[in-house]
Regions:
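Glycine-rich phosphate-binding loops of nucleotide-dependent enzymes
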Residues: 2-253
Length: 253
């Protein structure tokens, strides 16, 4: 494993009964890059992503993070190693404020149990750090807003803020643009670019314009296998990708 690669899979696969959802996926994610995992519906993206974040156990193959074999490591321990998925710790409490949600995530990162009956004064030292994280994702002005009352796009930003509370070296985002309007897509895309500084990001995303704008490298899955890999120009020019992903003649721009 090269030191330039932060995450590597070796012949990673998952079978459900007699159905091979993912087969022989060899993935290399370069340190400091934004890497996209794309493909048509049923290509195996979600299963692959779930294996990487340890929510689904691989049937075979290995997963290496920073050279360490994490194939059998528990999700919580993987997060402590610096590999975090956006929803992994960000089940947002709808009736807490944005600040309180991030503070809960910081408590988890410190190993403190969350206690609704604990005096707020004991949590005050976490407020400054929580505000810094909210500022990073553009939510400083919504710090005291109850989560249920903020827009869906800002909820997605809050999810990212709670994930950043883990101080991850690598961030995995599962369809970050899903359900967003055009204005929110632009906002979250800019946020992803901003938080990628000094971090590695792997994302599953269906919005090809976002993939084109953000990704340094793209892996295309189809029928559970890697079909192509490269930058957007190379992948979008690949005839097999056109046939499998969007159909011949689709305009990629």
């Amino acid at each position: 494993m090269s030191e330039d690669d932060i995450l590597v899979t070796e012949r990673l696969g998952k079978s459900f009964g007699g159905f091979a959802a993912v087969s022989d996926v060899n993935l290399k994610v370069r340190r400091g890059s934004i890497h996209a995992l794309i493909g048509p519906n049923g290509a195996g993206k979600t299963t692959c992503f779930n294996m990487l974040t340890k929510f689904v156990a691989p049937s075979f193959g290995r997963i290496l993070f920073n050279g360490r074999d994490i194939t059998a490591t528990r999700p919580a321990d993987v997060a402590r190693l610096g590999l975090a998925r956006s929803f992994q710790i960000s089940a947002i409490f709808p009736h807490l404020t944005a600040l309180e949600n991030v503070r809960v995530a910081l408590q988890r990162h410190r190993g403190d149990s969350f206690d609704f009956w604990r005096s707020k004064k004991t949590l005050t030292p976490l407020n400054a750090h929580a505000m810094e994280l909210l500022d990073q994702v553009g939510l400083a002005d919504w710090a005291n807003s109850v989560a249920v009352e903020i827009s869906y796009g800002r909820k997605r930003a809050l999810e990212i803020a709670t994930t950043l509370a883990l101080d991850p070296e690598m961030l995995l985002l599962d369809e970050p643009m899903a359900g967003l309007g055009l204005e929110d897509i632009d906002r979250i895309a800019a946020l992803i670019r901003r938080v990628s500084a000094n971090r590695t990001i792997l994302m599953v995303e269906h919005n090809l314009q976002v993939v084109a704008d953000l990704s340094d490298r793209i892996t295309v899955l189809t029928r559970g296998r890697v079909l192509a890999e490269g930058d957007y120009r190379a992948v979008s020019a690949n005839q097999q990708v056109r046939q499998a992903y969007m159909g011949v003649g689709y305009g990629y721009g």
